[in-house]
Amino acid sequence: SSYDLLVIRSPWDYPRRVAEFEEWFDRVAAMTRVLNEPALVRWNLDKRYLAQLAERGIGVVPTTYVATTDDASAALAAHGDAWVVLKPSVSAGSHDTALVRADSPEAEELAQRVITRGATLMVQPEIPELSQGAERALYLIDGQLAHAIAKGALLERGGGFIGGVYQETPQVVTTTAEEVAFAEATVAAV
């Protein structure tokens, strides 16, 4: 309460301590002003927000959310032997995230691990452009583009990280009018 403002920057361990983070966040938000808005921070903790964005007309990677091992097996089978990205819906730093063949033992093992701990698993088809490092992040402040980065590829096909370690390689990029329009539409949908 002795602070005028709290800016949340990098709470990288929140996925391992969700309940503790939420309790702390509720206490702090009751005592001081928080950026971003507390409701937005809570909404953003779980990547199931992607389904809400899709319902609002925003293009997202097709995603199946599963909470049981039977549903995970069915979701993986629907992809045959294609490459898929698997990850918990509450995650950061690509923890328990992998790019694997849908019919591989690694896919079943990761699905089991995520679901057994009570988390929701996301199953997404590989988007080759993203696997090649073309994912972009556009940062808007008060609705205006501040800057953009190409995030770089992280996941090695077959599991693990490229080069064996989690290493982000962001590069500042110039955006297209189409990318800015998409970012603005996404913010408006939130």
What are these regions (language model features)?
Residues 1-67, 71-73:
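Conserved N-proximal alpha/beta basic substrate-recognition cap immediately N-terminal to
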Residues 39-41, 67-71, 89-93, 103-106, ...:
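Short acidic/polar capping segments at secondary-structure boundaries
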Residues 2, 73-79, 112:
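Short amphipathic alpha-helix with an adjacent loop that forms part of the alpha/beta core around
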Residues 52-60, 78, 103, 113-116:
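Basic phosphate/pyrophosphate-binding loop/patch that engages nucleotide-derived ligands
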